[in-house]
Amino acid sequence: MAHMIVAGNWKMNASKSAVTELLSGLKDNVASVSNAELVVFPPFPYLAQAQAELMGTGIRIGVQNICAQDKGAYTGEVSLVMAKEFDVSYVLVGHSERRALFAEDDSQEAAKYVATQAMLLTPILCVGETLEQREQGRTLSVVNGQIQAVIDAAGGASFAHAVIAYEPVWAIGTGLTASPMQAQEVHRAIRDHIADVAPEQARGLKILYGGSVTAASAEELFAQADIDGGLVGGASLQALSLIHI
């Protein structure tokens, strides 16, 4: 199995004590993970705690969202400059919950992607379709449109320093998951779309699956040719679940 990325998005969950317990479990078991890079995405208030507790472990830290602006009158926002002080490596860009709940559009996500790379951090660009869009046969047009917005803003070569996560919206937090064949079809299409403008970058690009990944579903999903790991939600709140994935 090729080197993979397994990223745990905690969303708006956990507490100080829960973070300590979760990170302790990951640290105790990370030595058993030889074929994947582990990344955790805590809520902002726990970044300093994660930084301190994960130092020297090889487990990476990411943030769930950022503001594309460096500083200013943006009440409630957190800049990349601030996030970088906590040894952050990755930034989620365009998660479906940001798009759906906060009405963020492709142009905003492209701006965050560009800003993330300007700070020498790695964006994980999240793309995916709703159930309605899938039933209308629009999956690939929606996903490729979300990617094209980034290509237009940053160029295809930018994917040398990025990761993509395909997250079918209908499979997030629902217990549903795309079949390995369905996921592979979209992952292959994503790679092909980027290859049209940046073939070398497309070949080396990590494309994660992010639709209710569990230990039970991970093995078959990760065996697919174009699936390079997972963006894990609920299962990442239990250390052993993430390790087993």
Map each language-model feature to its residues.
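Hydrophobic faces of well-ordered beta-strands that scaffold small-molecule active sites
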Residues: 6-8, 38-42, 61-64, 91-93, ...
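Conserved N-terminal beta1-alpha1 strand-loop-helix module at the mouth
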Residues: 1-69, 73-78
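Active-site rim beta-loop-alpha module in soluble metabolic enzymes
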Residues: 123-200
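Active-site-adjacent beta->alpha loops and helix N-cap segments on the catalytic face
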Residues: 45-52, 75, 100-111, 179-184, ...
